[in-house]
C-alpha cells in the first residue's frame, strides 16, 4: 500500500514541499532564515489576532485600549510585547535573508527574487501601519510625516494624501483604515509566501558554491527539518529574552505619550528597521527626490539580476566582491545610525555620503568589480 503522505492530494503537496523535497547537501545556516521568517509571520498573525480582540481603532480610545491590554487582559503584556518585538525579529531575519540572497547570487532566480521584493514592500507597509495603531506621539507624527511624502507627487499629490487620510489631517478615519489594512495584509503576505515557495521549488535551492547541485541532493526531512528546529529554538530564545528582560529596548519613549496634534516631538523617527531608508530620504534636500530615493533604496534590488556581470554566481570565490559586499553592509549600518540622529552637522553630510555610496556600490562598483574578476580568472 502506498504511504498516505504520497497518495493523499493534500498530504502530497506538504510531502513535496517539506518532507521528500530534494535539497542541496551543503546549504549553510544562512539558508535557515526562510523558515525563520515563516515562524515570525506565524507568531505575528497569532499575537496580532489576540491583540485585535481587545484593541479599538478609535482616536479617543486606541491609546487606552493598548494600556488596557497590557494591564488588564490575561497575559496581554506578553502578547503585546511579543508582537512589537516579533516585528523586530521579522526584520532582522528579512535583512539577513536578503543579504544571503545578494552574497550567494540567489537573485538569479528572478521570479523568486521579484516575489521576495514584493514581500519586502508588503511587510514594510504592514509594519508602518502597525506602528500607527497604538496612537502615541510617534505613531501620529510618523503617520503624518510619511503619508505627507505622497504630496510630492506632481499634480495628484495633495488629493492623494487627503484621500489616504480620509480628511484634511491624520484622524479617526486614518486610524480605522490603517487598522483594517494592518489586519488584512499579513494574510496577503502569507499568500505571497506560497507563491514565493512555488517559484523556489520550480528551480530548487541555491547553495553556497553557486554551482548546480542536482547530482548531490538529500531529502529535506530529517536533515533540514532538524536544522530548522534548532533555528526556531534560537529565535524563540532571543525573542523571549528581549520580551521578558527589556521589552522597550527597541521602541521609542515618545510613544508612551498619547498622540497630540498640537505638540510636535523634537525628533520624529520611525522604528529602527526603517532608519536606513529614512536616512536616504532625508539626505536629499528636494522632497520629490527624497521620495524617489526612498522607494529606489528597496526597488534597486529588482535590478540586481540585470547587473550580475560575473561568470560565477556566488561571491564565495570572489574576494574583491566580498570586500564590496561587506562595505555595503557597513554602509547600511551607518545609514541606520544616521537615520536616528537629528538633522544637523556633521550627520547631514555623513548621511549624504552614505546614501551616495549605497547606490554607487550596487549600480556601479559591484558590476565593474565582477568584470575585473572575470579578467583575473584568465590569468
From Swiss-Prot:
The keyword Metal-binding applies. The chain crosses the membrane at residues 33-53, 77-98, 113-133, 178-198, 226-246, 288-308, 320-340, 347-367. It is found in: Mitochondrion inner membrane. GO terms for biological process: mitochondrial electron transport, ubiquinol to cytochrome c. One of its GO terms (molecular function) is ubiquinol-cytochrome-c reductase activity. It is a multi-pass membrane protein. Keywords: Electron transport, Heme, Iron, Membrane, Metal-binding, Mitochondrion, Mitochondrion inner membrane, Respiratory chain, Transmembrane, Transmembrane helix, Transport, Ubiquinone. GO terms for cellular component: mitochondrial inner membrane; respiratory chain complex III. A ubiquinone binds at residue 201. The keyword Hydrolase does not apply. Binds 2 heme b groups non-covalently. SUPFAM superfamilies: a domain/subunit of cytochrome bc1 complex (Ubiquinol-cytochrome c reductase), Transmembrane di-heme cytochromes. Heme b b566 binds at residues 97, 196. Heme b b562 binds at residues 83, 182. Its cofactor is heme b. InterPro entries: Cyt_b/b6_C (IPR005798), Cyt_b/b6_C_sf (IPR036150), Cyt_b/b6_N (IPR005797), Cytb/b6-like_sf (IPR027387), Cytochrome_b (IPR030689), Cytochrome_b_C_euk/bac (IPR048260), Cytochrome_b_N_euk/bac (IPR048259), Di-haem_cyt_TM (IPR016174). The cytochrome bc1 complex contains 11 subunits: 3 respiratory subunits (MT-CYB, CYC1 and UQCRFS1), 2 core proteins (UQCRC1 and UQCRC2) and 6 low-molecular weight proteins (UQCRH/QCR6, UQCRB/QCR7, UQCRQ/QCR8, UQCR10/QCR9, UQCR11/QCR10 and a cleavage product of UQCRFS1). This cytochrome bc1 complex then forms a dimer. Belongs to the cytochrome b family. Heme 1 (or BL or b562) is low-potential and absorbs at about 562 nm, and heme 2 (or BH or b566) is high-potential and absorbs at about 566 nm. Component of the ubiquinol-cytochrome c reductase complex (complex III or cytochrome b-c1 complex) that is part of the mitochondrial respiratory chain. The b-c1 complex mediates electron transfer from ubiquinol to cytochrome c. Contributes to the generation of a proton gradient across the mitochondrial membrane that is then used for ATP synthesis. This is Cytochrome b. The gene is MT-CYB.
Amino acid at each position: 500500500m502506498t504511504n498516505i503522505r504520497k497518495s493523499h492530494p493534500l498530504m502530497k503537496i506538504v510531502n513535496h514541499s517539506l518532507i521528500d523535497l530534494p535539497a542541496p547537501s551543503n546549504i549553510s545556516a544562512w539558508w535557515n532564515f526562510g523558515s525563520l521568517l515563516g515562524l515570525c509571520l506565524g507568531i505575528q498573525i497569532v499575537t496580532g489576532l489576540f491583540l485585535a480582540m481587545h484593541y479599538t481603532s478609535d482616536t479617543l480610545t486606541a491609546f487606552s485600549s493598548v494600556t488596557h491590554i497590557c494591564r488588564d487582559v490575561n497575559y496581554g503584556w506578553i502578547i503585546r510585547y511579543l508582537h512589537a518585538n516579533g516585528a523586530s525579529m521579522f526584520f532582522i531575519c528579512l535583512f539577513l535573508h536578503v543579504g544571503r540572497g545578494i552574497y550567494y547570487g540567489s537573485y538569479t532566480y528572478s521570479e523568486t527574487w521579484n516575489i521576495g521584493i514584493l514581500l519586502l514592500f508588503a511587510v514594510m507597509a504592514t509594519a508602518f501601519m502597525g506602528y500607527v495603531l497604538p496612537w502615541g506621539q510617534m505613531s501620529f507624527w510618523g503617520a503624518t510625516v510619511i503619508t505627507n511624502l505622497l504630496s510630492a507627487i506632481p499634480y495628484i499629490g495633495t488629493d492623494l494624501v487627503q484621500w489616504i487620510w480620509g480628511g484634511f489631517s491624520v484622524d479617526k478615519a486614518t486610524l480605522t483604515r490603517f487598522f483594517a489594512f494592518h489586519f488584512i495584509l499579513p494574510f496577503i503576505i502569507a499568500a505571497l509566501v506560497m507563491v514565493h515557495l512555488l517559484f523556489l521549488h520550480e528551480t530548487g535551492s541555491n547553495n553556497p558554491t553557486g554551482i548546480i547541485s542536482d547530482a548531490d541532493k538529500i531529502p529535506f526531512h530529517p536533515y533540514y527539518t532538524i536544522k530548522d528546529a534548532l533555528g526556531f529554538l534560537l529565535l524563540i530564545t532571543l525573542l523571549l529574552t528581549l520580551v521578558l528582560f527589556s521589552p522597550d529596548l527597541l521602541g521609542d519613549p515618545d510613544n508612551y505619550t498619547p498622540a497630540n496634534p498640537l505638540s510636535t516631538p523634537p525628533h520624529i523617527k520611525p522604528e529602527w528597521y526603517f532608519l536606513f531608508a529614512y536616512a536616504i530620504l532625508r539626505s536629499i534636500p528636494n522632497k520629490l527626490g527624497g521620495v524617489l530615493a526612498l522607494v529606489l533604496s528597496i526597488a534597486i534590488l529588482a535590478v540586481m539580476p540585470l547587473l550580475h556581470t560575473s561568470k560565477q554566481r556566488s561571491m564565495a570565490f570572489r574576494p574583491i566582491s566580498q570586500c564590496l559586499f561587506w562595505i555595503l553592509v557597513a554602509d547600511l549600518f551607518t545609514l541606520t545610525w544616521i537615520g536616528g540622529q537629528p538633522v544637523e552637522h556633521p550627520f547631514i553630510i555623513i548621511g549624504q555620503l552614505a546614501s551616495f555610496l549605497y547606490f554607487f556600490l550596487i549600480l556601479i562598483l559591484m558590476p565593474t568589480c565582477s568584470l575585473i574578476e572575470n579578467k583575473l580568472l584568465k590569468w
